């Protein structure tokens, strides 16, 4: 880390899900708009090494970085808000910290010392924070997961308390996000939860420099004075995080309050004025959308929409680019079968089957894919969605009735989808896996190059000979079936550089039927969108207009 780099630590109190990630990303956006080089980091207090093996229903989406890290979904917010890409160093957990410390203890690196939370765990946290910030970064924004008062968060809070002492006040800043509930019956905003949250933080040894109060509406100076009096935070360092129609409006609201100007002042930064014209254009585009299309998303994690966070945002972004609002109809794949399939999609303008793991709800997804294929409904399959599209085609077009994935049915005699046992990474490294390999961190992860077939719809959409998209999978199309599938009309329009892995499929005779092994949603942003999703939504708009 450069000795001139500033660090802003963002903590949260009272309750979870206040929007720490969006607040942190918005602050990064504001500083970036002033010409600064900004990066971000998320520290997660849970003991899992990473979220890769956690249920999406518990944790939400697993966001994959370009260099192959399985991370918290907040990193998706970060990449949608700022231009810098996140890396392996941008997210670490309690589990990863302990794993590193214990590995060094086994090697004897601590020379027989008794390993303790302080100093060994806190030192490892500090090391990862400082070494994870590149030399050319002006400001790093570090979000601490969890809520102040949680026992799991204490080592992280102690570590950043120590960093404040070691780096100095001129290089560090504490921003604390709290809840300011509005009691409708009394018609009052209540400041007591905020007071207690700041007091809890002070008990750990951290005095907040800036307070961000999440509430339904902006509060006046009388509430600010009261909060300032009881929290030891200057009145002009207290800001409102009010509810907005779209999260992409948050940077604009903070800028209107002078939030970024205050950060620049407190950190003694020399910057130009903020240029938020791109974000104003994004918000104006969102507000000016006319019409609506309905996308039926068929999955098994639909009870928690955060499980598909980046995918949802990619669809919304593509809608904005097409001038329409996207309504996502979540369909539980376990409820769909060949008999009732039509009832789920009679109001849908397009169908999407996202990624997932395990056999639960698979036949419902296959029935949905068949319905889209046979009824000329625009279809997009992602990861498992592509694999099941191949299974469906093999069963119902090639007539291979027991075609399946060896992941979902190990005893199938026609495994059109099988385990990838070997592949080459972008850096030339050869990876090998078996059915007995650990689940955690053993998939084909990160950005991989895909060569697009000349004359294909995919090449027309991307307007490129090859693209890099991010992957997270361990099963792939079985190459023994590729020729038969292509002879029957299924085109493999994208392949890995070595031609061994099938990356994209399409049906030329269909109005819009494309599926990809990668996760293109991870690179969609509100400013730039994503060509594949934009084309998909355009097809949905055309169907809607008929």
Curated annotation (Swiss-Prot):
<protein>
    <recommendedName>
        <fullName>CTP synthase</fullName>
        <ecNumber>6.3.4.2</ecNumber>
    </recommendedName>
</protein>
<keyword id="KW-0436">Ligase</keyword>
<dbReference type="InterPro" id="IPR027417">
    <property type="entry name" value="P-loop_NTPase"/>
</dbReference>
<comment type="function">
    <text>Catalyzes the ATP-dependent amination of UTP to CTP with either L-glutamine or ammonia as the source of nitrogen. Regulates intracellular CTP levels through interactions with the four ribonucleotide triphosphates.</text>
</comment>
<dbReference type="GO" id="GO:0005829">
    <property type="term" value="C:cytosol"/>
</dbReference>
<comment type="pathway">
    <text>Pyrimidine metabolism; CTP biosynthesis via de novo pathway; CTP from UDP: step 2/2.</text>
</comment>
<keyword id="KW-0479">Metal-binding</keyword>
<dbReference type="Pfam" id="PF00117">
    <property type="entry name" value="GATase"/>
</dbReference>
<keyword id="KW-0665">Pyrimidine biosynthesis</keyword>
<feature type="active site">
    <location>
        <position position="521"/>
    </location>
</feature>
<feature type="binding site">
    <location>
        <position position="474"/>
    </location>
    <ligand>
        <name>L-glutamine</name>
    </ligand>
</feature>
<dbReference type="InterPro" id="IPR033828">
    <property type="entry name" value="GATase1_CTP_Synthase"/>
</dbReference>
<keyword id="KW-0067">ATP-binding</keyword>
<feature type="region of interest" description="Amidoligase domain">
    <location>
        <begin position="1"/>
        <end position="269"/>
    </location>
</feature>
<dbReference type="InterPro" id="IPR017456">
    <property type="entry name" value="CTP_synthase_N"/>
</dbReference>
<dbReference type="GO" id="GO:0042802">
    <property type="term" value="F:identical protein binding"/>
</dbReference>
<feature type="binding site">
    <location>
        <position position="74"/>
    </location>
    <ligand>
        <name>Mg(2+)</name>
    </ligand>
</feature>
<dbReference type="GO" id="GO:0003883">
    <property type="term" value="F:CTP synthase activity"/>
</dbReference>
<feature type="binding site">
    <location>
        <position position="16"/>
    </location>
    <ligand>
        <name>CTP</name>
    </ligand>
</feature>
<feature type="binding site">
    <location>
        <begin position="190"/>
        <end position="195"/>
    </location>
    <ligand>
        <name>UTP</name>
    </ligand>
</feature>
<feature type="binding site">
    <location>
        <position position="226"/>
    </location>
    <ligand>
        <name>UTP</name>
    </ligand>
</feature>
<dbReference type="GO" id="GO:0004359">
    <property type="term" value="F:glutaminase activity"/>
</dbReference>
<feature type="binding site">
    <location>
        <begin position="190"/>
        <end position="195"/>
    </location>
    <ligand>
        <name>CTP</name>
    </ligand>
</feature>
<feature type="binding site">
    <location>
        <begin position="17"/>
        <end position="22"/>
    </location>
    <ligand>
        <name>ATP</name>
    </ligand>
</feature>
<feature type="binding site">
    <location>
        <position position="356"/>
    </location>
    <ligand>
        <name>L-glutamine</name>
    </ligand>
</feature>
<dbReference type="InterPro" id="IPR029062">
    <property type="entry name" value="Class_I_gatase-like"/>
</dbReference>
<feature type="binding site">
    <location>
        <position position="226"/>
    </location>
    <ligand>
        <name>CTP</name>
    </ligand>
</feature>
<feature type="binding site">
    <location>
        <position position="407"/>
    </location>
    <ligand>
        <name>L-glutamine</name>
    </ligand>
</feature>
<feature type="domain" description="Glutamine amidotransferase type-1">
    <location>
        <begin position="294"/>
        <end position="546"/>
    </location>
</feature>
<keyword id="KW-0547">Nucleotide-binding</keyword>
<feature type="active site">
    <location>
        <position position="519"/>
    </location>
</feature>
<feature type="binding site">
    <location>
        <begin position="150"/>
        <end position="152"/>
    </location>
    <ligand>
        <name>CTP</name>
    </ligand>
</feature>
<dbReference type="Pfam" id="PF06418">
    <property type="entry name" value="CTP_synth_N"/>
</dbReference>
<feature type="binding site">
    <location>
        <position position="16"/>
    </location>
    <ligand>
        <name>UTP</name>
    </ligand>
</feature>
<dbReference type="InterPro" id="IPR004468">
    <property type="entry name" value="CTP_synthase"/>
</dbReference>
<feature type="active site" description="Nucleophile; for glutamine hydrolysis">
    <location>
        <position position="383"/>
    </location>
</feature>
<feature type="binding site">
    <location>
        <position position="143"/>
    </location>
    <ligand>
        <name>Mg(2+)</name>
    </ligand>
</feature>
<feature type="binding site">
    <location>
        <begin position="384"/>
        <end position="387"/>
    </location>
    <ligand>
        <name>L-glutamine</name>
    </ligand>
</feature>
<dbReference type="GO" id="GO:0044210">
    <property type="term" value="P:'de novo' CTP biosynthetic process"/>
</dbReference>
<feature type="binding site">
    <location>
        <position position="74"/>
    </location>
    <ligand>
        <name>ATP</name>
    </ligand>
</feature>
<dbReference type="GO" id="GO:0005524">
    <property type="term" value="F:ATP binding"/>
</dbReference>
<dbReference type="GO" id="GO:0019856">
    <property type="term" value="P:pyrimidine nucleobase biosynthetic process"/>
</dbReference>
